[in-house]
Amino acid sequence: MALPIDPMEEPRMYQQTLLQDGLYDLLESDMMVDCVLKIKDKEFPCHRLVLAACSSYFRAFFKSGVEESKQREIVLEDVEPGVMGIILKYLYTSNINVTEQNVQDIFALSNMLQIPSIFTVCVSFLQKRLSLSNCLAIFRLGLMLDCPRLAISARNFACERFQFITRDEEFLQLTPSELAAVLASDSLNVETEQDVFEALIKWVGHDQENRIGDLPDLLDCIRLRLVPRDYFVKNVEKHEWLSSNPEITKKLQLVKDAHAGKLPELKKTKNKKSPSEEGQKKGDEEEVEEEEEQEERLPGILNDNLRFGMFLRELIFLINDSASVAYDPTGNDCYVASVSTQIPKNHCSLVTKENQIFVAGGLFFDEQSKDEQIYSYFLQFDPASSDWMGMPPIPSPRFLFGMGEAENFIFVIGGREMKEGENILNTVMVYDRQFLKWAESDPLPYLVYGHGVVSHNEMIYVIGGKGENKECLNRVCAYDIKTHQWKDLAPLNTARSLFGVTIHKNNIYVVAGVTDSGLTGSAEVYDIKTNKWSEFVEFPQDRSSLSLVSVSGVLYAVGGFAMFPKEDSDDLMPLEMNDIWRYDESERTWSGILRENRYASGATVLGVRLNTLRLTKM
């Protein structure tokens, strides 16, 4: 439904339309044309009044009184006719076709001609199309055209993705001042200051001969007080480019002194203030100058303000079809990460070693596909926008499958077909994160569903589940991505499915689940080095679909289903639990830390790192 027009604005809108349509009719009819812009071999008839009204450049030119301004034909040099034609059409019609191919030329010419409306259109166009491949180029363009809005937007976009843009050739082409604007930013999304220092060294090394002289000034952008002391001694203080430069060694001594608790004394300077009305006296009394004391600032190299990315916390991430919520077990705080409702029920989730978060599952219907119309959703969480991004869907819809990762690939393993018959699968689909494509990988040696999958050191482990006879399995298999082979490992002590599983301190932990005789709370741990399973502390309650995560070196169990008697009956029924438990290694016991978190209902659970500055505290 269209928004109502403001009655006060309605006459203005009608008059603007009438005026613009009338001017365009005059142009098309070649009436009252008093000016021709000649650009190379092209001529553009137009009206001086329109040019002067829309462009400060032409207004100043026509008012200058110079001989050229009085002539009917005005020659413009170093301008492309096609771009000028686009701009003139906009001045008469308000219509403009900005594309990725012409935006830079339109932007530059509108800047030269000082037409703010087109300038703003180009800025908005570029802001909406910021990407890893163009953000630094747009940042440099914004600086070149003196457009702070565009330069800051592009710089912030680049700072948000600092780890990625430093791999790009465009990063190595930045000028010293452009690089300083990035490295000095508080909004850098880095977990450690070492990353910023190493990016600077990489930039200098790209053209050492010409850039080594910029190092002393650029080093002020690095917050060396945030660097661990052992790293500072080994990688900073002893670096040949730094240790051989007297100016830099003096700065490094300031950092060493700061590490020892000694900061330079800051002198106070006095600034004269102009007299205020309160300081003025009646009559001929002299004005009194007030003096204000101002403290000097610390040298830039001693800046110890945390960067934006340094507010990352390890959290328990609960993902269900109503919201995505992060729980901090150390502070008992809960944060909203996303309120998106596009997450399918009965999904599977995965966090990669790079902390990328993916969700797969559910049914996705593609009406435009001629070959195959049914897919499974595949989504990736974007922390910057707090939303889930649609990725290429999984070609074969399935449920009760497992997800793992190795190198740059995500694996979807086994499960049951989301079709009539619900056939058990051994197929493996692999997603290439670089090329954003799905393909089929080496199949699992057996059919399985309801199993657990974990990844460690580029190996993918498939544990337990149910086989083709619907009986629980104790089988454990590992896939080596380098040899493309599946290999059987030591079996589970207890065959089970729908259990909690995670990597914790380089071992695989399995807790609770479903056995052929019912639910269990038993637990076991697999030593990857010795290929042996051993008993672990039993969970206090028999449960299925328990989630197990390792966060900040601590093991947590979340939710699941337990059996309870029905009212007025001895029959048992499953009841979903939404609690959170923590394992105490010193006491070797499980203890409940949160009785209920409603977002644990129907959720998959991950141990992730998220920036709490982005999240809304509940």
From Swiss-Prot:
Pfam families: BACK, BTB, Kelch_KLHDC2_KLHL20_DRC7. Keywords: Cytoplasm, Developmental protein, Kelch repeat, Repeat, Ubl conjugation pathway. GO terms for biological process: muscle structure development; positive regulation of proteasomal ubiquitin-dependent protein catabolic process; positive regulation of protein ubiquitination; proteasome-mediated ubiquitin-dependent protein catabolic process; skeletal muscle fiber development; skeletal muscle fiber differentiation; swimming. Disruption phenotype: Morpholino knockdown of the protein results in a curved trunk and small head at 48 hpf. Morphants show disruption of skeletal muscle patterning with an irregular, wavy appearance of the striated myofibers and extensive gaps between the myofibers. Myofibers show disorganized and irregular patterns with small aggregates of alpha-actinin, suggesting nemaline bodies. Animals exhibit sporadic muscle tremor and coordinated swimming is not observed. It is found in: Cytoplasm; Cytoplasm, Myofibril, Sarcomere, A band; Cytoplasm, Myofibril, Sarcomere, I band. PROSITE patterns: BTB (PS50097). The keyword Cytoplasm applies. Expressed in skeletal muscle. Detected in the eye at much lower levels. Coiled coil: none annotated. InterPro entries: BACK (IPR011705), BTB-kelch_protein (IPR017096), BTB/POZ_dom (IPR000210), Kelch-typ_b-propeller (IPR015915), Kelch_1 (IPR006652), KLHL40_BTB/POZ_dom (IPR030607), SKP1/BTB/POZ_sf (IPR011333). Residues 33-100 form the BTB domain. SMART domains: BACK, BTB, Kelch. Kelch repeats lie at residues 356-408, 409-458, 459-506, 508-553, 555-608. One of its GO terms (molecular function) is ubiquitin-like ligase-substrate adaptor activity. Residues 264-284 have a biased composition (Basic and acidic residues). Residues 135-237 form the BACK domain. Substrate-specific adapter of a BCR (BTB-CUL3-RBX1) E3 ubiquitin ligase complex. Required for skeletal muscle development. This is Kelch-like protein 40b. The lineage of its organism: Eukaryota, Metazoa, Chordata, Craniata, Vertebrata. The gene is klhl40b.
